[in-house]
Amino acid sequence: MKELVEIMAKSLVNNPSAVVVEEETTGTSTVLRLHVAPEDMGKVIGKQGRIAKAIRTVMKAVATRENVKVVVEIV
């Protein structure tokens, strides 16, 4: 799942080398923290959070298939 978030984020930003995804798993729950360069933050979030919501929706679908809970944080 970490790789999927990283691929999606790198395709959106101008500085793909600054994209870092941290994964923290506890039991059946996974927290993915997406770090991007400050100037790319708006591109990852999108207008009214649409891009961020789309990323979270895709990850929720993947997590449902794998029977886990996933939270995507953009920091």
Language-model features and meaning:
Residues 1-43, 47, 53-75:
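RNA-contacting regions in translation and RNA-metabolism proteins
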